[in-house]
Amino acid sequence: MRRRTIVLGCGFGVLFVAYLMIGLLVIHTGAPDELIFAPQANPSGQALEVYAEIVSVDAVRDAIDLRLDFATGRDRLGLRFTGPSDRDMVIEVGDGDSEQQIAWHAGQWMTSHPLSVDIRRGNVQDYPFDRYTATLTMAAYASAEVANGMMVPLRTTVWKRLPAWDITISATQPPSDPATITLTFGVRRADLHILFATTIYCAMAVMAIIALSVGSLLYLGVRRMDTTMAAVLAAMVFTLPGLRGLMPGNPPLGVHGDSLVFFWAEISVVIGLALTVATWAIGRGDR
């Protein structure tokens, strides 16, 4: 009795420490959500203001969706985004695999531009420890055509807060071409989502061990047959898919965690239930 009390107390102590650690993780203040990347050298002309907002991360189709806004003028309250362009301008944007041009004519309203950036490295199969890397290169030219235009310096602001994701951004500007900026996005799942997904997979593994243990002990006659255990194991069969549906981020079925844990946990519970039913059918538990 004393040993069980000590073990139970240690278990509650570990649970309390884990609760405190998660609490500290929740109230932790991270880096600023808005990052500003200004030209490294003093621009010879007026810089083009670019505001990039991360709208979503789609790990299934390997893409990061952005919304770009541009401003060339300033009102008394601040920058005037989606205002009229003060000159003919062409903005080149590319992610290393594809490139597109955004063209504005003098006086044309610069509306928001949606953009999808391909993920260069990362695989959703590694869920919940999947990490992704993507790059976005931008350059602006003060002309209706790139070939005849003079490069315009860029002052880029990025809003990186996105629920369920932890995003880091860095910028590089080649010394030979200071008007070109390359943004590198590092994306991974939020710490709490990783913890929650890992906990669910651990719960599946524990349920599998319980099911195999109960079924084996009943079948071997170590424990007396109890039909209540059959009901519990039958409930586990349907509980496991429900737990899988609670995975944060809705990962596609078949990720590595499913192959290593969920699939075998479901089979283990079914085997445990089959052993229990077989024990009841042959009446071994009543001997």
Language-model segments: residues:
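Hydrophobic secretory-pathway targeting helix
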Residues: 1-35
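Soluble non-transmembrane domains of integral membrane proteins
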Residues: 25-42, 46-163, 168
